[in-house]
Amino acid sequence: MIYEGKAITVTALESGIVELKFDLKGESVNKFNRLTLNELRQAVDAIKADASVKGVIVSSGKDVFIVGADITEFVENFKLPDAELIAGNLEANKIFSDFEDLNVPTVAAINGIALGGGLEMCLAADFRVMADSAKIGLPEVKLGIYPGFGGTVRLPRLIGVDNAVEWIASGKENRAEDALKVSAVDAVVTADKLGAAALDLIKRAISGELDYKAKRQPKLEKLKLNAIEQMMAFETAKGFVAGQAGPNYPAPVEAIKTIQKAANFGRDKALEVEAAGFAKLAKTSASNCLIGLFLNDQELKKKAKVYDKIAKDVKQAAVLGAGIMGGGIAYQSASKGTPILMKDINEHGIEQGLAEAAKLLVGRVDKGRMTPAKMAEVLNGIRPTLSYGDFGNVDLVVEAVVENPKVKQAVLAEVENHVREDAILASNTSTISISLLAKALKRPENFVGMHFFNPVHMMPLVEVIRGEKSSDLAVATTVAYAKKMGKNPIVVNDCPGFLVNRVLFPYFGGFAKLVSAGVDFVRIDKVMEKFGWPMGPAYLMDVVGIDTGHHGRDVMAEGFPDRMKDDRRSAIDALYEAKRLGQKNGKGFYAYEADKKGKQKKLVDSSVLEVLKPIVYEQRDVTDEDIINWMMIPLCLETVRCLEDGIVETAAEADMGLVYGIGFPLFRGGALRYIDSIGVAEFVALADQYAELGALYHPTAKLREMAKNGQSFFG
């Protein structure tokens, strides 16, 4: 044993060849934390000091290679002054450079996922051999930063600027065959032959058959592009990537600028350029919010794992109510491996549900994401039925009938008589109280809410709603089933609107107030889209459906009359009464017509102004900043109330619910992190400036206390 640590070992294999193996004790994956970096330094020094070493193979003792840096540790460094952050980064980079400079050939054997620092470790090796099932990539831009362990320096010198820019700016994971095409790796083999292939490569390099020094040299030098080639490559890339990323995500363009600034430098000077740019990005609001979301997501995954311990396995599911929603749920279940019965009361509903599932499957086949054989297998996993005959074997039933409490209660009571006593019933309701629906059941402990968002195949969130009598087993089993379907479940307690709709309707309330104050809804949409929302509130209301919004608004007003009830008619009333229901019937705030591909195209329709005229009660002069505040303050304050009321347990769950459920701007991190970014005291003062708009704008006593004590939602 040449070196033995808790994360890394270096052992002799044969004939002077050693294996540097990453295998972090007590963890399921390898990652670069302080311990691993320190041990890599010691391991490299030990190899350097051993004159008998003739070659090094880098490997992993886990199913993955290295997933990247331990962001929970490194995020603390981001708070350091720039000079300290840069110095620390360069110190870490010296380890990778010293490994690269070893006076013997090196081969990285990539057995599984190698991301971020994991791939950067591989780039420092002379040769890379990759299992055909592995994936590699530099996903740092998704955290608002860019690669900081030499990725912006080595990758463009290995695979060319255009390819490197695509990899770094997109943050995508790349399959083995694609990595081989651009020469990011030297060979691809089946996983069982990886060790032998790495050994063969290192022997050929030791013998001189492969010139490892020549292979290494381009990574140490400046880029092989003249001034004109550089200008064409970088300026074109910056323009394209800036258009794709938008102004709120600076990391992709900064990465290109860094590669450009370092183009005429050798490795060590180029690494200094990388470190300076990395420190700049680490201080941005976008990186703070995006890293916060990543950490929130990790917290959610940990919570979901706790439920796994008591959950029952759902081997057979059922959905009640076919149609588009039922078909979407059936598709999602069957495509992820859980067969599902799809029941409706008539053939038309069944046909609609099957058509929806088939449409989604055909779309995947057309895009090359699924084989026709797999499509047939998924369709066979959806069994349509008009009766309860086969429900005796069902583990979990999702009720997805019309959003009416009496209808839902009747259907749930009926199905309860046809399933096993331990079967779980879940209602896909967006607003109706789970505890109210449970009153119709003999076994309310087996009943929960399971709120899918539309369209089911695209929206990642599922709210699992715990009613007053819902058992831990029912909640856990539903969470596990949602995960199995490829969704991100969040457990919420019962209340009108649960989490997402309870928070969304105050946002719509702010929008309604603006329209009634004479503000053009097209302008409001533009301002909120610029703020970062995927679509403005008028367009979103059209997509949701004016009738759906009208019903939801009434449910929320009944549940929270002190702040959500408005006796005046609003824009949604005017459109609903005029039967302008949004995209579903071609007219809402906007008009819609299908383009050549059948996609709904949004058009400005001046006739809506006459419809809205009676609900415009004044003409206020508001700034764009006012528009943002009228919209965002009620949304943020309702999120605070949800946390205070225990509807969600943690700030992380609240923020992730809004990101996954309604497309809250990623770079702003969620409603509670948005408050933190302003400052709790400053946000309370801001809300007080709009207090005359009503109770939705009034901070809670607890929030005022937080402001007074200088507290925040995230440390």
Curated annotation (Swiss-Prot):
GO terms for biological process: fatty acid beta-oxidation. NAD(+) binds at residues 325, 344, 401-403, 408, 430, 454. Pathway: Lipid metabolism; fatty acid beta-oxidation. Induction: By palmitic acid. The active site is at residue 451. GO terms for molecular function: 3-hydroxybutyryl-CoA epimerase activity; delta(3)-delta(2)-enoyl-CoA isomerase activity; enoyl-CoA hydratase activity; long-chain-3-hydroxyacyl-CoA dehydrogenase activity; NAD+ binding. Residues 1-190 are annotated as: Enoyl-CoA hydratase/isomerase. GO terms for cellular component: fatty acid beta-oxidation multienzyme complex. The keyword Oxidoreductase applies. Residues 312-715 are annotated as: 3-hydroxyacyl-CoA dehydrogenase. Its EC number is 4.2.1.17, 5.1.2.3, 5.3.3.8, 1.1.1.35. Gene3D superfamilies: 1.10.1040.50, 2-enoyl-CoA Hydratase, Chain A, domain 1, NAD(P)-binding Rossmann-like Domain. It catalyses: a (3S)-3-hydroxyacyl-CoA + NAD(+) = a 3-oxoacyl-CoA + NADH + H(+); a (3S)-3-hydroxyacyl-CoA = a (2E)-enoyl-CoA + H2O; a 4-saturated-(3S)-3-hydroxyacyl-CoA = a (3E)-enoyl-CoA + H2O; (3S)-3-hydroxybutanoyl-CoA = (3R)-3-hydroxybutanoyl-CoA. The record marks 120, 140 as: Important for catalytic activity. Substrate binds at residues 297, 501, 660. Keywords: Fatty acid metabolism, Isomerase, Lipid degradation, Lipid metabolism, Lyase, Multifunctional enzyme, NAD, Oxidoreductase. PANTHER family: TRIFUNCTIONAL ENZYME SUBUNIT ALPHA, TRIFUNCTIONAL ENZYME SUBUNIT ALPHA, MITOCHONDRIAL. In the N-terminal section; belongs to the enoyl-CoA hydratase/isomerase family. In the C-terminal section; belongs to the 3-hydroxyacyl-CoA dehydrogenase family. This is Fatty acid oxidation complex subunit alpha. The gene is fadB.
